[in-house]
């Protein structure tokens, strides 16, 4: 996740004895590695970025723990990342994990296996740390202040949960944490052998129920901007509008039209 990389880079960039830095993030859907070079105190160059698909959330949010096969696959992936880091002669590194480990009953076992197999000490971030990092990353962008001066909803979508923060007239009104993440919904509703249309209807009804109280209390008025925070937000932007991908913005009407087009496609066509 880019937000965590930003945090780790800030920590490391103050020490100019470090020339090459690696950051690993263990997420709900994948494990990723980024390697950076510090050219001076202000210039940071990304050397490599590798993502390995691994659905840890499929176990963690449906069974309550991460299965042995997924633990093996995770350790193998991290061992490969370690070899890549050695090839770059990395001076320092950080390894972070999201709620996918924090919510797993066998978190300590997984962390122990990672350490025994790779030597990595993984830092599992709390929900508050995770959200703070995400919003700090967004707040650092030039357009953020302009957006919140009228009204905006920052929606942080994760595998375990979503968090919605409402801004009006430059002030933070509320932040609400709702356990309706992508993997949680999929594990709850996604494997029942029902037709796609009925599946979509159930998701819509489920989300409406979860958001009912929130809308009644905080959404009597609409918002001018929606700030989407997600692992795949930029990929989504690129699919909707190439120009939107470049400036990280897309018109609401275009977003709605894109979603309507998806509703007429099968899951295979979408993926």
Task: List each model region and its residues.
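N-terminal glycine/serine-rich phosphate-binding loop of ATP-dependent small-molecule kinases
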Residues: 2-11, 16-22, 26-32, 36-97, ...
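Intrinsic structural disorder
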Residues: 1-7, 135, 162
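Helical "lid/coupling" subdomains associated with nucleotide-phosphate turnover
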Residues: 21, 59-83, 87, 100-110, ...
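Long, contiguous hydrophobic alpha-helical segments, chiefly transmembrane helices and signal peptides
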Residues: 54-56, 101, 157
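Gly/Thr-rich phosphate-binding beta-strand-loop-beta motif of the actin/hexokinase/Hsp70
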Residues: 9, 14-44, 146-178, 231
